[in-house]
Amino acid sequence: MIHKLMRAATVMGLLVVAGGLGSTDVLRADPKPPQVIQSGFESTDQLLKDVERAEKAPLYSAWIVESSRFLNVPHRAFQPDVGDPPFVDLPVNVGIIKDPNGEITLYDSGWKQLAYIFNWNNSCCWKGLRDQMEAIGLDPGDVTRIVLGHGHWDHAGQLSEFPNAVVYIQKEELSQIDFFLDYPVDFNAGHIRAVNTIDPLTGQQVGPPQQACARSPVCGYPPQTVQEILGKTLGGKAKIIDGRHEINAGLIIHPAFRGHTYGSQLLQVNTARGQLVFGSDTYSAWTGIRDWLVANIQQTDTIQQFLAYEKCYVLTSRLNSFDNCISAHEPTTYTAAYPITSNWWNIPNGNCSRAAELILAPGESTHVPANPDRTPPSQCVSVIPPHPIIP
């Protein structure tokens, strides 16, 4: 013990000589943030260089569409630091990015496992992504890439709807899926299964047995979603990457490992309003990244999440800052309160789903209808499945 104290005293003495813990030189000696995987490291200088390079690239157009909507979610379950209002509706947003050549990159793909939507969740307004794109004047046949922010069921559910598109997925995300395929749902005499489907006070079944993992990370990867992802990887339609990856000039993937899942990733897009950064659930709420709030603590490493916030702040620092951070589940999406999504409308024949035009490149015509339907969500909620439940 004495030796340990002496070593500690020696170290503290050296720190004092060097100028203390806050010394600029000390900080310069370790410029990398405390990220857990080497390929996830990106310094501020590296990120700013990506911005400078991207600003010389062609400009992209961007939209989002609402794949579906969670209803009446307890606010503190989504953002523990926020409790007003006590319940919120959360969209499930998909990014659509069009390059000057007309090719389209999707960021996420929404969901398709309708049993999750209408049986196991209080949700509404589902519509197939291809139908949504056609309804707003975009050709699904032009989709050549899908960048998967992460592989959960509400984000990776419609990959197979775009058979010619190549999916960009982090090696770390596949590692997480592999791990969770053997997750011990029945461990300890079925305790995990029991606490998720049985009311401990009455002993009554309160959820379907298939939902037994609802509070464990494995539930993000149900069989249908795993099939969607593995279908692409085994079918030669996936590009498995490890960290930062430049798809094209002005279109760059940045790792956000453990920010939400093992292999979460951001997508930087060069536009006329600066760099947009799509974040999926790494910053599932724009108000979260704006106000530096924890989100979705059940499946998030908070330190890595905040490091992802920092990446978006740096990438958007030259123009519009965090207003250019695009989240998947921001409750104020499709309102003036989330400025970049304020040019929104209800998708025609879209089962009450919505779209927003974020920014147009020069020469791209608007896709907003001449007389857009902006019926408030409270007056347009469809909880009816558009076709029979898919098990």
Give the positions of each predicted feature.
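Cap/insert and terminal regions of metallo-dependent hydrolase folds
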Residues: 30-33, 264-266, 270-391
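Bacterial N-terminal signal peptides
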Residues: 9-20
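Active-site metal-binding motif and surrounding structural segment of the metallo-beta-lactamase
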Residues: 120-169
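Bacterial N-terminal signal peptides that target proteins for export
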Residues: 1-10
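Core dinuclear metal-dependent hydrolase active-site scaffold
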Residues: 64, 94-99, 103-105, 114, ...
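Zn-dependent metallo-beta-lactamase
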Residues: 26-104, 111-113, 120, 318, ...
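Active-site metal-binding loops of divalent metal-dependent hydrolases
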Residues: 67-68, 109-112, 151, 173, ...
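Metallo-beta-lactamase
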Residues: 49-50, 127-138, 142, 171-255, ...
